């Protein structure tokens, strides 16, 4: 044996495999204000102790690998490793635990959601020792969140740009989502905006297809916006979807929108990716564009209760990456969303400081310091009868978006927009007068419909429409 080999052996390196919990389970650890904290829902394989499972998550999402390596001795694992510092049993679930993991801040690149997720969820979810794994929540310390720009503008700046206060904003997704020519698409936009909506929207999969190329759509929508603004005296917008196959093409589309003078563009942030989204958010702040975010593909990641990632984590990541609006479910419409859980991540989007509240699914106190807020968008299977509940649930700082609930009106798009605007104004007035929207909502809509034939027709069409299915993802009891 050579002297060099003898020296390496003498420093204590021992090849082989050892339990993760010996290094990465540290129940005595006191978390630091600068740590990123994660709450994982862990379902170990039979025979795997929860401490070993939690430690494996901490190891595989930070410095660990499956065997001891001699290069561990070339750095300070104690400084850089993730630590599973607490484990609790999930009441009512067999062999399921919440494992809390603390990550040192130096593990992450500044201002990069991409790097943060690559570390925390990039590899560990396929680990064989775990039957299932879900990231329930993250605590982002101010020392990390301050390295992000965040939303291009935020709630107050958007209201100032639009000169609209004291009520939710109204939107509409143009339908059919695919197949319209650019000119007919622009016509639908114009009818909705002149009827009283604040915004219309490209659907998430409207990019640049053979039936309607993006530049043609942008031009006809800009024409519709200017015409509706001239007729109504209100500032209008259409979410022009800039999502594209490359970042360069995406920015080119945003540049065109800016040159047309429109107020807002749109991005599909999960399918487009966080790097592209952050790049677009920076461009939007630099060039005065609002940024609407669609969460297409989110349910692939967040719908199952025991595996994946909860939407509250995706919402926090979006606030850091940048967006002025994001779709957040409706509670009352056709898409998944339990009320208390939805309100929990709505507050995480809008508020500066959110206290830990397990009854709403919030595992950690979150302090965003001065990062601007994001407006939640309620969209999916909603109509005029839902207006009181939506106004009561989401409050003023929200966008209520009616696609079929506008374009499905028996008299056309503009009357559909009128019906929604009248219903909203009636609900806001009733609320301001002290009436209980939750209890008196239907009566408020009926009273308003006496003075609006458009609303009366909408009420008749959708009086029997309900989406009453039990949510898949519920809060733990």
Curated annotation (Swiss-Prot):
Its EC number is 4.1.1.39. It comes from Hyophorbe lagenicaulis. Mg(2+) binds at residues 201, 203-204. Pfam families: RuBisCO_large, RuBisCO_large_N. GO terms for molecular function: magnesium ion binding; monooxygenase activity; ribulose-bisphosphate carboxylase activity. The modification N6,N6,N6-trimethyllysine is found at residue 14. The modification N6-carboxylysine is found at residue 201. It comes from the Eukaryota. The modification N-acetylproline is found at residue 3. Substrate binds at residues 123, 173, 177, 295, 327, 379. It catalyses: 2 (2R)-3-phosphoglycerate + 2 H(+) = D-ribulose 1,5-bisphosphate + CO2 + H2O; D-ribulose 1,5-bisphosphate + O2 = 2-phosphoglycolate + (2R)-3-phosphoglycerate + 2 H(+). The gene is rbcL. The disulfide bond which can form in the large chain dimeric partners within the hexadecamer appears to be associated with oxidative stress and protein turnover. GO terms for biological process: photorespiration; reductive pentose-phosphate cycle. Residues 1-2 form a propeptide. This is Ribulose bisphosphate carboxylase large chain. Keywords: Acetylation, Calvin cycle, Carbon dioxide fixation, Chloroplast, Disulfide bond, Lyase, Magnesium, Metal-binding, Methylation, Monooxygenase, Oxidoreductase, Photorespiration, Photosynthesis, Plastid. The record marks 334 as: Transition state stabilizer. The basic functional RuBisCO is composed of a large chain homodimer in a 'head-to-tail' conformation. In form I RuBisCO this homodimer is arranged in a barrel-like tetramer with the small subunits forming a tetrameric 'cap' on each end of the 'barrel'. GO terms for cellular component: chloroplast. It is found in: Plastid, Chloroplast. Its cofactor is Mg(2+).
